[in-house]
C-alpha cells in the first residue's frame, strides 16, 4: 500500500493527482517572465528545469537562479530537475559534474524535492538519495524512455528498483508507438501502485500518450506535468486545461 509524502502542505500519493508546472528559461530575464506568467496558474508543484539555462555549466549560476525561484514561490513545493541529454534533457554533462551539482543543490536546501536519474551508477545514486534525505529534501528517482515503451513487467521492475534505492517518489516516462503501449503503461502503473510503498509518477509521452496525464488518479500516478509557458516534454497539456479536465473528471464521477 502506497504511503503519502507531505511537502509544504501538499500531499503527494493521496487524493487527487497533483499538477507540476515546469519552469523553462534560458536566462534571468526569461526566468523572471516565466515566474510572472505562472504565478496565478492552478498548479501544485513548481519544477525548475535548470538544464535549459544557458549557464547550465555553472553551479554557482544555477544556485543563484534556484534562489530566485524559491523566493518567487515560497509556499509551493519546489522540484529541482537537471535533465541530462541522455534522458531527454538539454545539457550533456559528465557524471562528476551531475552529482557535484546535485550535492550543491542539496546542501543549499533550496529545493523541497530533487530529481535523480536512476541509471547514473547505483553507488552514486544511493549516496545522493541519502544526502538529500539527510538535508530534509525528498528524492525523486526517475527514468525516461524516449523511443519505446518497455513491457509491463520491466516498467514495474524499474519503479521497484527506484524504491529499493531509497526513493521518496518513483517516476518513469515512456514513449508509446501504439495505443497498446499506453495501455501497457497504465497497467504497469496500476500494478506498481499495488506493490509500491512510495508514491509513483508515470506518463506515456506524446499525443498518443496524453490520456495517461489525465488518468493518474484512476491508475495510481501521483503527479502529472502540465506546461505553463513552454513544454519540457512531448505531450504536456497546458496547466489551466489540465486542471479543468481533472476537475471535470473528478466532479463528473458522482
Curated annotation (Swiss-Prot):
Pathway stated in the Swiss-Prot or TrEMBL entry: Metabolic intermediate biosynthesis; chorismate biosynthesis; chorismate from D-erythrose 4-phosphate and phosphoenolpyruvate: step 3/7
Xref: Pfam families: DHquinase_I
SUPFAM superfamilies: Aldolase (SSF51569)
Oligomer and partners: Homodimer.
Job of this protein: Involved in the third step of the chorismate pathway, which leads to the biosynthesis of aromatic amino acids. Catalyzes the cis-dehydration of 3-dehydroquinate (DHQ) and introduces the first double bond of the aromatic ring to yield 3-dehydroshikimate.
Binding site for 3-dehydroquinate: 47-49, 83, 213, 232, 236
GO biological process: 3,4-dihydroxybenzoate biosynthetic process; amino acid biosynthetic process; aromatic amino acid family biosynthetic process; chorismate biosynthetic process
Active site: 144 (proton donor/acceptor), 171 (schiff-base intermediate with substrate)
Family assignment from sequence similarity: Belongs to the type-I 3-dehydroquinase family.
Keyword Magnesium: no
Catalysed reaction equations from the record: 3-dehydroquinate = 3-dehydroshikimate + H2O
EC class of the enzyme, as a word: lyase
Keyword Amino-acid biosynthesis: yes
EC code: 4.2.1.10
InterPro entries assigned: Aldolase_TIM, DHquinase_I, Type-I_3-dehydroquinase
Descriptive protein name: 3-dehydroquinate dehydratase
MF GO annotations: 3-dehydroquinate dehydratase activity
Gene name per UniProt: aroD
Superkingdom in the source lineage: Bacteria
Organism: Neisseria meningitidis serogroup B (strain ATCC BAA-335 / MC58)
Taxonomic placement: Bacteria, Pseudomonadati, Pseudomonadota, Betaproteobacteria, Neisseriales
Keyword entries, A-Z: Amino-acid biosynthesis, Aromatic amino acid biosynthesis, Lyase, Schiff base
